[in-house]
Amino acid sequence: MPSFDVDSIRARFPALSLTHEGRPMAFFDGPGGTQVPDTVIDAVSRYYRDSNANAGGDFLTSRRSDAVVAEAHAALGDLLGAESPAEIKLGANMTSLTLHVSRSITAAMDPGDEIVVTRLDHEANVGPWLSAAADRGLTVRTVDARPDDVTLDLDSLDLALGPRTRLVAVGWASNAVGTINPVAEIARRAHAVGAWVYVDAVHAAPHLPIDVRAVSADFLACSAYKFFGPHLGVLYGRRDILEALPTYKIRPAHDRYETGTGNFEGQAGALAAVEYLADIGRREATSAAPVTDRRAALVAGLTAIRTYEMELYRRLADGLERLPGTRIHGIVERHRFDDRTPTAAVTFDDLSPAAVSAALGSQGIATWHGDFYATGLIERLGLAGRGGVLRIGLTHYNTAAEVDRLLESLATILTARPAAAASV
């Protein structure tokens, strides 16, 4: 396989040329939203220039909008491994889509039926189910997270499942600590008791190939702005389930899960983001492993991205573990790195995550601090009263030089920790 050409990748992202006080910006904020390649920017601009009209009309720009809508649904279906574009529904963001469809899903449930959520999940895959359960008189059971390695406690899952379980809501990967859950196994156990599975793949989508059929997901949601696109929510639903569920709309129609006029410019950008990822796969193709279609190109591209990112993450983890008073929360054993994304959740003995993030930001290094709406997890780890964690998120446009710069900056901040703490 050809070596991963990160320099060519970086040339596609205009934001990577930004500077802060004379130094290049280094973006480790990807889990909160990635930068976008030039083709995504161009696609959004081109839509407004050449196609700006509502859909369904008998004139040029409206027909072009129709084409964008159809092509975006098809491309996002390829990204997720859906059987048909009809299984893809688009909305403002993952949270809004989940809130919307949760009402449809729970409408078929009876009081006393049960929903299972987890303590490892983002609130977007917890809160909507709690609200729907309160409205319908449902019982909510919670799968625990193991504090030692911050993975799901599957024994707790087995205890939560029962004859009245109707839905299991689980994340593919933790946006806070990077843990990858055994989604296929969780789905197998859920289906064994007759429950549907709703997967939050927001954090996983930019880092690895997603295949809804391989993991037997009944629903899966993600957001394009996390995989190098614009702000747009994406929902996959098994077609037979979607067609059977009631929907909450003024007048249900074929597009009943997509309320109001669509964000067509966002769909144009999401289409371009998918094509960008597929292009990486096409470049990675060899005569021994040719790429035959867009889905194959996406799998090849995201596989190459994962290999590169995890090599970079090993460099980051090695460096963090050498820093005194520093702890990585989550999977740290190198032989288990297949079960994590390149996202590090870090705490420090004598400095708050906020202080460290601000000090890094003053040097042009972007990170996040807090709980990232993984509220239950941060509480489970006992970190809610300590400001959560510093989150360092790698993406495929990061470099070894950027990682080294981050580590050097952290070493300086920690060495001067009394001054840093006083100044932030």
Identify the function of each model-found stretch:
Residues 1-424:
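Pyridoxal 5′-phosphate
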